[in-house]
């Protein structure tokens, strides 16, 4: 039972690390804010037009 518990803890740690790494490298910005796909600043909604987020609802 102990080896299975260690494996579960290891998998949980790996999952947490990947989750925080993904959030740290990718950011969502709102309407009118600066966006740039090269540095991973994407618009939450709409498209990045001339480095500004434009909402398309």
From Swiss-Prot:
The protein's UniProt keywords, in alphabetical order, are: Disulfide bond, Knottin, Neurotoxin, Secreted, Signal, Toxin
Q: Does the keyword Secreted apply?
A: yes
Spell out the subcellular localization from the entry. Answer: Secreted
Q: For this UniProt entry, what's an example GO CC term?
A: extracellular region
Summed up, the tissue specificity of this protein is:
Expressed by the venom gland. Exclusively expressed in the venom thoracic glands (and not in body tissues).
Q: Where is the signal peptide?
A: 1-24
Do the record's keywords include Disulfide bond? yes
Which branch of life, at top level?
Eukaryota
Task: Write out the GO MF terms.
Answer: toxin activity
Q: Which Cys pairs are S-S linked?
A: 28-44, 35-48, 43-53
Report the family membership.
Belongs to the asilidin-1 family.
What function does the entry list? May act as a neurotoxin.
**What does the record's free text say on domains?**
The presence of a 'disulfide through disulfide knot' structurally defines this protein as a knottin.
Q: Supply the name of the protein.
A: U-Asilidin(1)-Mar2a
């Amino acid at each position: 039972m102990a080896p299975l518990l260690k494996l579960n803890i290891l998998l949980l740690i790996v999952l947490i690390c990947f989750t925080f790494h993904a959030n740290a490298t990718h950011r969502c910005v709102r309407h009118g804010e600066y966006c740039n796909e090269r540095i991973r600043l994407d618009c939450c909604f709409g498209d990045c037009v001339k480095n500004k987020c434009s909402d398309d609802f």
